[in-house]
Amino acid sequence: MKSCLKMLLVAGAFAVSLAAFQDDALADTQLASWYGPGLEGNLTASGDVFEPYTEYTAASPYLPFGTDLLVTYGGYSVVVEVTDRGPYTGGRDLDLSAAAAEEIGLTYTGVDYVDVEVLN
């Protein structure tokens, strides 16, 4: 009985810590940049045609393709879909399409921290 109670306590503690980790993964501040010039019409890692000036998309090194993100910067927000891998410059977490970056004003600074929330 005592060992059963200990197992329940350990399992409960694990479940609580896992839930906290998942919540942290849903909203985060990440270093973002943008990309697009010279890449229009190329295939993304997911197989989609890259349309940087008309579509709100993003590249992430680890989020699954099809993940929708709410990206906020300077009081402006945009919803993007992860369709590509990258960025490939050290320290950056997210690459936004030119259209998405322009929507929130990131094209002026080029690289900056943004708030990111996973929507699905």
Predicted features by range, described:
Residues 2-8, 14, 18-120:
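Secreted/periplasmic proteins
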